[in-house]
Amino acid sequence: MAFFSIFKQGQIYLNTWPQEAKLGIIFPENRIMKATSFAQKFMPFVAVFAILWQQIYAKNDLMAFSIAILTALFALLIPFQGLYWLGKRANSPLENQSAVWFYDICERLKQQNEPLPFVQEKPTYQHLAEVLRKAQSKFERAFWQEI
């Protein structure tokens, strides 16, 4: 898998995974996704603020400027760390217990004649996210309490 496609897959996974509180107990995705979304929104402002602050208060200090540049780069790279983790996670095969749970939800969706994602060998976390998204739209709130 190409390096940049991991980031793209991470963004797709971020947009697909349902933000259900019950899932946050089982999977770390909810916390990672909240942090990544927050970083995508606010870290560019932190980067600009770091450089502007340095330019206002220490205009001629090259050491302060280099520290501000490093701070800005660090702030801009934080969202990429989250997207990279999500991209790797999306392509990881499900653990045994999660795979059983995946097939159980697929059976419930088949009973309602809902189209399911194509799974070649072992289902991945991206497949689970797609199935959970469909389950979120098709099943009532009681479904999440059964989990």
Curated annotation (Swiss-Prot):
- UniProt feature coiled coil, ranges: none
Q: Where in the cell is it found?
A: Cell inner membrane
InterPro entries for this protein: UPF0208
Q: What is its main location?
A: membrane
Q: What topology does the record note for this protein and the membrane? A: Multi-pass membrane protein
Q: Which GO terms describe its cellular component?
A: plasma membrane
Question: Where are the bilayer-spanning segments?
Answer: 38-58, 67-87
Sorted keywords for this record are:
Cell inner membrane, Cell membrane, Membrane, Transmembrane, Transmembrane helix
- Pfam families per the record? DUF412
Annotated family: Belongs to the UPF0208 family.
What name does the UniProt record give this protein? UPF0208 membrane protein CGSHiEE_06015
Q: In which organism is this protein found? A: Haemophilus influenzae (strain PittEE)
